[in-house]
A protein has these predicted regions:
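Short secondary-structure boundary elements
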Residues: 4-232, 236-244
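Internal alpha-solenoid helical repeat scaffolds
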Residues: 244-263
Length: 263
């Protein structure tokens, strides 16, 4: 059904004026594509979860749009939307693959920084996915509407492609995050490199670069007294070192091993 018909249905279901339900109906339309079965399913789900509630004092249904935007979809609705991914343009599918590398959600600031680093129209493509109901854009984040949608996007890549994606995004983000002093994005960049692993390195000179980035990340974690995370960064840094690292990068190697031992 179209947006007008859906709004009429929602208004009648909640016994409210269509004017009062229009914003809610827009959210429902994005999440269900107007499928009547899923509209009813979603309204029931939100009512059961307390996101749609009957106010006895006001004598009408009420809801919190921000909480509804962040709520995950029921499994059957998510499966329906997952099948729609293949019908999207290649640019939008590519943007979903990129976002899926960062997990269930990513900050808009990170995505904008990655867009500048890669020189593409990532934000525009992700906004199309939001309009299609595959993503939610709220609380300064892009979030997959359901884990299955994130998994389907991630599974569009084979293992080697995933490693290359993780590595390239980490290498692209790290210098931008350093220049802008964004520690959160910097740590995310290093995490991407570690997800890729040493096997993703194609230029031998990058081994020491990534090891040094892990050294910096480990030091930041130690400053926050997160010694478990710090050890993980130092250990990952060591794994990126090449066989002759004691000869070629003695100071870097010594610092990584010493700090790992302290954790």
């Amino acid at each position: 059904m179209d947006e007008h018909t859906l709004n009429t249905m929602v208004a009648e279901t909640l016994c409210l004026s269509p004017r009062l339900t229009r914003a809610l109906s827009n959210i429902i339309y994005r999440k269900t594509k107007g499928n009547p079965l899923f509209v009813s399913r979603l309204i029931r789900s939100w009512s059961n979860d307390g996101l749609l509630r009957l106010s006895m004092s006001r004598g009408r249904w009420e809801w919190d749009e921000e909480k509804i935007l962040c709520q995950k979809l029921p499994d059957d609705v998510a499966e329906f939307l997952t099948r729609s991914i293949e019908k999207l343009s290649e640019d939008v599918k590519s943007s979903l693959r990129i976002l899926s590398c960062f997990g269930a959600a990513s900050s808009i600031a990170l995505i904008e920084m990655l867009e500048r680093a890669l020189g593409n129209n990532l934000v525009d493509s992700l906004d199309v996915a939001v309009a299609e109901g595959l993503l939610d854009k709220a609380d300064d984040q892009y979030r997959f509407s359901h884990d299955r949608i994130q998994e389907a996007s991630y599974n569009m890549m084979d293992f080697l492609d995933r490693c290359n994606y993780h590595f390239n995004y980490g290498m692209a983000l790290a210098p931008w995050a350093s220049r802008e002093g964004d520690d959160g994005v910097f740590l995310t960049a290093v995490n991407q490199l570690n997800l890729a692993g040493p096997e993703a390195v194609q230029d031998k000179s990058q081994n020491a670069v990534v090891a040094n980035l892990n050294l910096r990340a480990g030091k930041k974690a130690m400053e926050m007294s997160d010694f478990e995370a710090a050890y993980s960064y130092f250990d990952n840094g060591i794994s990126f070192l090449r066989k002759k690292h004691w000869k070629e990068h003695y100071t870097l190697s010594l610092e990584l091993f010493n700090l790992a031992a302290k954790c």
